[in-house]
Amino acid sequence: MNLYRQSCLRAIIAFGTALVLAMGSASADAQQPTDYTALGLEDLMALDVVAINVLGTHIHPAGQWMIGYEYMFDNMDGNLEGTHRVGDSRVLDAYNASPTDMTMQTHMVTVMYSPTINLTLMGMLPYISKSMNHVMRDGTRFNERTEGPGDAEVHALYTLFSTDNLRHRLILNGGVSFPTGSIDRSMGGSRLEYPMQLGSGTVDLMPGLTYLGQNEQMAWGAEFDPTFRLGQNGNQYRLGNRYRLSGWGAMKLTQSASLSGRVDAESWGDIRGSDSALDPTDEPTKDVSAQGGRRVDLMVGLNAYFPSGGLKGLRLAVEAGAPVYQSLNGPQLQTTWLARVGLQWAF
């Protein structure tokens, strides 16, 4: 692991340690409610033990604003074809170069507002940094880097159903992604491959459905949120549709802190069409038939919420995990581990 990745990992661990200390401090002043069923939505948010990055959980009281920041780190190392590991030499039998490893960092800024108790509006804008290493047939190694804004998203979350005590809720998500991320990134005068571009280049529909369950000590739920690409982009291709299904459970450690576990399953298709500036025989990352796949991630997280005091409305979270299953239309780089750090403030 290079120094850059070590620095990222140390930062995540340091944040997690600080989070645990903060949770302990917050719990010392917290008081246990005596009648859970009498609590309103704002009080339920103080009890909420759901992971910060589950989109459908962001339902807020009428008139409330929330701003958020999330840092996401994805590490990829080695190639898979189906579920089998493929060495560089085998990749180089078919292509001029082989990707060896890649990192992706995403800084996501989110703004939310709830005009009514049943409706939350949300806007999201990512800033993405990518780095990919390669090896050529003659043993030459090289690196490619790119960074910039990704595709902006807007969402509307609407409560379709809720029990009187709010222990069971069904949330509908209507989302749209706009092509603000570049699909024309180049390096050394050559167009970068598909995974190194920053956006889809198309308007994408992002519907979703979320179930939330919660009692005094636990929370659970499931979410389905596909992404449908509309038409081809300006470079005459479109990314494959994505289908994501998540299930989670969480248990309170203190009145203000929780431990969560999440299973995240995702499937995505190959690219339709092709960018004429990319030679598919050059490397698999330029081959439209080597872009799809399926993956199941197992994530564990710590979450904290401050319902009162000087940090009232502040929510902190750290989550990390790794794939437990991958099958890729390869050869394609496999994901080895992921980490998420989030900060949100409601007012």
Locations of regions flagged by a protein language model:
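Short loop/turn motifs that connect adjacent beta-strands in outer-membrane beta-barrel proteins
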Residues: 55-64, 76-80, 101, 118, ...
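Residues on the lipid-exposed face of transmembrane beta-strands in outer-membrane beta-barrel proteins
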Residues: 57, 69, 109-113, 123, ...
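Outer-membrane beta-barrel proteins
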Residues: 49-56, 115-117, 157-165, 170, ...
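Extracellular loop and loop/strand-boundary signature of outer-membrane beta-barrel proteins
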Residues: 54, 92-97, 137-144, 192-197, ...
